[in-house]
Amino acid sequence: MHVTRINLKTDKDMKKREGLINFCLKGEIKYVAIGWSHIYGTREIKDYRDYYDIVKGSEKRNGKRINSALNTFLDTKADDLFWTRDLDGMYWICRAKGEAIPKCDKELDIGAVVPVEGYLVGLEVPGQISGSFNRVNGGIKQSLDKEKEIVEYSKYMFNSRAGRNVYEVKKMEGGLLNNLSSFDLEELARKNSGLPIAEKP
């Protein structure tokens, strides 16, 4: 299972950014998406592998290295987790429902999507997650797999927001608690004390 930070709002055109965020996070069906919509029309694209190969060839011809986000989508499987943000800076946790698929929207520059189950988390997340969005030249995506605590936190947060246990969360000696936001620490304390649960932000 992979946990990845993905930026959805890289375009400088505010209308495009807003349209992309609305398409990905505000609809009944939610997605994480990447661009390269310009390659559509060059040849038939049946699946993500076709899309990937065409983009890779196009980038190579233009003397560019392939963007790592393309490989991330190629490797995505059901139950992989993504962290993203909306235009208000709110964090979202998203679970992949399956593999990446080609989807063309030239106006929003969408070339491929991963259908997801996504939930608003709020403004407070561990520093390792928030920091990954603020890195200079951080790119479209960053893998968060190396930090075991972040993987477990991400699974915990998805379960919490979904209201069901999709993931088994491993018990960690203090590590998981160190990564909880103050709101989630309070919620956890309330659950264990029998007090009413606070409303989610």
Name every feature range the model reports, one short phrase each.
Residues H2-K77, D86-D88, W92-P201:
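Mixed-charge (Asp/Glu-Lys/Arg
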